Amino acid sequence: MKNFSFLLNGLLLCGLAELHAAQPIERAQNFQSTQSSGFIKPVAETSLADSEVIPSSPGDADLGEQWLLKYKEKSRPFTLTGDLAGYATNNAGLAETGTQSDQYFVGQVAAIYQPKFNDQLIGEFLIRQATFRYKRFSDLDFDAQTIGAGLTYLPPVLWNIAFYARYNYYRILDVQEHDEIFTNHSVTLGVQKSFALSRVHYLYGGYSSMFSLGDSSISTRNEHGAYAGYHVELTRSLQADLFYRVGLFDYANGGRSDINQVATVAAQYRLTKWLFAYASFSWTVNDSNGNRLDYSSLSPGIGLSANFKF
């Protein structure tokens, strides 16, 4: 990962151990933050031609859901989902110089409950387990667990503007030592506006802030960002997405502050009623006030996603 050389040279051994642990932590947090910029997974068995769809917020990615739907039929609030994906990266360690390429595997399973309290208020509850494994740099391997809950409010008179609030408990486990290396409680608040262009494509944009509530560590940070996206249904089985986000990562310790940008293009193809194949290509640039903490990376990926609603 990045060389955190802006820290005091006189760090104790425990501080150096924390720095080493921060390497997979930053990768994990970046993946968590930008998950909405990867392929946008469907949570319904109908296409835009069959249902009225509202794009969700990046906070929904923390809860495993990517779309909120106004069902014309009886809703099915429970979802079981699983993902298997492979990615390549030209900068596995998020380094400023001396970058190293690698490939990594991501597997995720989640259980989601999404009750619709009324036409304006939708809830969501999630339990998710994720596994990250690298081909060359096994010291970057980690497991991540998320428990979350949230609400999305859709005012009837504000022209497709949605307000959302999320709580997440996030836990990262070191694969080599089989112990916990990072935990965090966070609250995310945001607003999003959707612009329907037709029944098969639309634009959306929004803003969100994530506030960390856990104990301060070298990796604890607050995140504030604006984002925009475009979604199109090319056919009843093929979808495509463009996404861009610029965010401020404000770290609790060391005076570190990063401007992080992510751009993604993605496509998804429906193989069966419940199985989807997807591909994505992401570009990330990080500009930090810390010494040797700037980096950029490219990451193409392909995967399969299974979604069962009941």
Kindly label every feature range from the protein language model.
Residues 73, 114-120, 154-158, 196-200, ...:
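Outer-membrane beta-barrel channels and translocator barrels
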